[in-house]
């Protein structure tokens, strides 16, 4: 603390006075996250050195998932918890980091679901879910029920937007895109929204766009522009109105495009294990490139049939990739998937 780093703010052409940073990380500093990578890597090494064993997914062992200071451990059994605690404490002692014990929670899976678990962890109750990076994780997770609650929360907030009254489409669209669709987009990367729920979201958005009184859910409204025309690009006379169904499918389809890129990642290895091996364990000669080859309906069905029952989201990603014909039109995927 005697030599605390100092910062000052540059705003409106002027500098503020210098001030000390005595805790935390300097926000907005491009070097800060890079430096923190060195600290986070130390935890990964400590876990490895302690011999902590993770969960096997085929031949792939998953032990730890890290994103900045958010860490999730996938332990093979409750016996691994002691080793993990030793590694964690050694890392804290070496780096000066400190775990927020109040936020520690655990999810018992498999044969451990109904057994007695060690103390010191807030274990998720049966029927509930844990949260990792904002995403719910649970046994027999009811994603439809989770989405229903999320849509209800967003709808209640949107029904208070009295400032929409009197605004035109483009003014309303800025708010609908950022404050309505924007409150749900993040989870499209990891959770399947059911078809009927997709229609609910689209119906709500249409009301917010076109109704004279957007807060009145019972009031009927009439479109001044045909739906098909409104969804076209503005350069061609459209309004760029969001097609939420295409949007959700594009989010899933782009995972296959990312999967085929050369960058290495643990999740790609897990997909390899599930998708690129036949019943005899033989690997596809084309590798990931098979997803951009002309495949027959039978071949597509065969690949999708390899996806384990617990990986429904992956199966939906493949389905959307195939039905949107990404092999022929990657530009369409990029346009739909990135619209905001």
What kind of region is each of these model predictions?
Residues 2, 13-15, 84, 98-129:
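Short, conserved micro-motifs composed of acidic
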Residues 24, 64-94, 110-111, 141-143:
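Catalytic palm subdomain of template-directed nucleic-acid polymerases
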